[in-house]
Regions:
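S-adenosylmethionine
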Residues: 1-134
Length: 134
């Protein structure tokens, strides 16, 4: 949520221009991000689907399954995608994609995700293990 205009000069006065700008930037709307569900689609499948729908995106260097959508993308446009309806792509923040990558789940690993709601990291761990984690 953007900060009210009158608040920005107060931040500058209190914290200085550099930190104030970082605070203001942190309050701006974030772009929508999603990941390919590797059990149902490749990143190339997702890219082709987004291209066909005219949805702009950027790829993420550190995770090939991740996509950052163009700022003008509406969620309803994503919800209407065939791959979304099939569960082949998942709306998930980039920061939420990091823990499963750090864990590196392997086939046969038993995982108890005690914070699973709505389950994005859990489904990502399942995909990273090739559908063979428990």
């Amino acid at each position: 949520m953007p900060l009210p205009a009158f608040f920005e000069p107060l931040l500058c006065e209190q914290y200085g221009p550099e930190l104030a700008e970082r605070i203001v930037e942190g309050c701006r709307a974030r772009r929508t991000t999603l990941r390919a569900n590797a059990l149902k689609a490749t990143p190339e499948d997702v890219a082709a689907c987004l291209d066909e729908a005219g949805i702009g995106y950027e790829r993420v260097d550190w995770y090939p399954d991740a996509f950052v959508l163009a700022a003008d993308t509406q969620l309803r446009d994503v919800w209407a995608l065939p791959l979304y309806e099939q569960g082949a792509l998942y709306l998930q923040s980039l920061s939420s994609m990091l823990p499963p990558l750090a864990l590196g789940p392997e086939p046969g690993l038993d995982v108890l995700d005690m914070c699973a709601a709505p389950g994005g990291k859990t489904t990502q761990m399942e995909a990273l293990s090739g559908g063979r984690a428990h």
